[in-house]
C-alpha cells in the first residue's frame, strides 16, 4: 500500500439554484465555455457548496486546527471539505495527500484522498489510491463509484461499468450510481441502454435535478428534444430549459458529440 501511495505523492431549489443547473448543464455539454468540474467526479452536474463568508471563516478556523496537528486525520478531512466548499480543490487534495502519507492504513483518509484526485483530474493516481481504500471483503459503494468515475474519465468504459455495477449490488437503485452507469453507456455509444438506465435513475425517490438533467442530455443525443425539454422544465424555467435544449441540438449535430459528455457522473452521497 505504501508503494502506491508514495508513487502518487511523488507525482504530484431557488432561482439561483435553477440558474446554476442551467449553467452546469451547458458546461457538461461542453458548450458553456467554462471549466467547471464536478465533485467526485463521479461528474456531471453538481454544485460545489457554499461560497459564503461563513464557509471562508470555517476554512480559516479549521486551518488553525490543522496546522496545530497536521497528523489528525479527522481534522484533515474536515479542513479539506471546507477548502472544497470555497473552490480550493487543489489545496484540499494537497491536505489529504499529507494526511494519507501520515496515515497510510486509514481507509477513510485514502478514500477521501482518492476522490480528491479524481476531482483535480489525476485519474490514474486516483485509481492507485482508491484500490487501497477498501477491500474485496468489505467493499464501499462510494469508493467503487469513485473508481468508476476515474476509469470513465480515462475512457475505460467497460471497467467503469464494472465498478458501477459492483456498487449497485451494495446500494441497489442508488440514483447517482445508475446515472453514472447510464453516462458510461452513452460514452460507449449505447444510447438505448443509457436511456433505460437513466430513466430508472430518475424514477428513484432520491433522484435530483442532476440525474434528470443527465437523462435529458441522453434524450437530446437521441434527437428527442421535446422529451428532453419536458424533463428540464421540472427543475428550471421554460426559458432556461429552451436554452439548454438549443445547446443539446448543437451537441447532437456534432459528429463527435459523445466526446463532449461528462465522463465522471453524479457524485454519490456521503
Language model: regions and residue ranges:
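N-terminal leader/linker segments that initiate helical-solenoid repeat arrays
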Residues: 3, 25-26, 30-78, 82-86, ...
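Terminal, low-structured helical/coil segments at or just beyond the last alpha-helical repeat
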Residues: 39-40, 205, 209-270
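Structural marker of alpha-solenoid helical repeat scaffolds
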Residues: 68-69, 102-103, 133-137, 170, ...
